[in-house]
């Protein structure tokens, strides 16, 4: 039943019926059946129902089942190879089809279903227009490399999308949220706050949590910054930044410096040259420094708490990642532990779950379940825009 719940959630998150059929190994007709049961009965509708036929002339005999199970224990093969082996060893027995042998192995607990890959939720909003400085910053890690002494280096780079100004080119000791947040905080204090930060879907910028948020991007949301993400496997969405990486590599990494300190010195020299000396054709042969101005939005001394509209019920997330609603707890995600979420009622049963302006999903107050998305027919009934 857990797989069916996950299938339903994946469908609501945008997976097509055909893709789900391949991922979960079920027929499209079966998926439509589960969607109908879920709409009518909620999660309870996904439970197994009796499928015992009144008459089963093709039932596999206990003797055949015993042979199949014994063969599986001896050879860890799939149904096709097992059938060939069994037919050669016992030619007098009418062996069932490969699919039936597969079902016998499945019922005996001798198969392992491949788990579907959990992906970062897609960013469903159009990319922000860029026609001025600090409207969008782009950030990414330049691919790691080793300096002459064998030390691994992971340079974090941040640019202003409009002016191409290289705000940071910094070697971080680790690619985790703590070190990355420290680099961004220093950048915010020097240059002010952008309206949008565009990254890929990797850690620590994004995660598989609802809304695709991570600890780093959650702080951005509190600062009033939109955390914008590229489409999966689409580096062209951050093309300006990738072209800067190509120039950075040609200028500073062929070959790398002797040690990280010297490598950072090389990055600092490149940053100055890139910003103040190198003309950019896209800027009319001006330099980035001639086109960049600090943001009028200063970094506050303390990161503010999120605020919600009056029509939202505000709930604090427990350490275990759940919120209390109508006397029962519903799990959302542990990443939001101790954070305040807004629950905007859509009708008597469904609530939109918000982290500031970011939609995380929907809470079913009757079933006490959280869904990252809702079925199209239900969204239309609730008057929701396409998400």
Where are these regions (language model features)?
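Mobile-element integrase/transposase regions
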Residues: 59, 99, 105-165, 173, ...
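C-terminal, beta-rich DNA-binding module of retroviral/retroelements integrases
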Residues: 271, 275-387
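A structural microfeature
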Residues: 167-168, 361
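Charged alpha-helix within mobile-element recombinases
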Residues: 209, 215-300, 342, 346-347
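Mobile genetic element proteins and their domesticated derivatives, centered on retroelements
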Residues: 7, 20-21, 31-34, 42, ...
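Basic, flexible linker segments flanking DNA-binding modules
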Residues: 43-138, 144, 214-217, 287-299
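Short, basic alpha-helical/linker "hinge" immediately adjacent to a nucleic-acid-recognition surface
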Residues: 1, 9, 17-73
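Acidic/histidine-rich, metal-coordinating catalytic segments
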Residues: 175, 188-209, 231-233, 238, ...
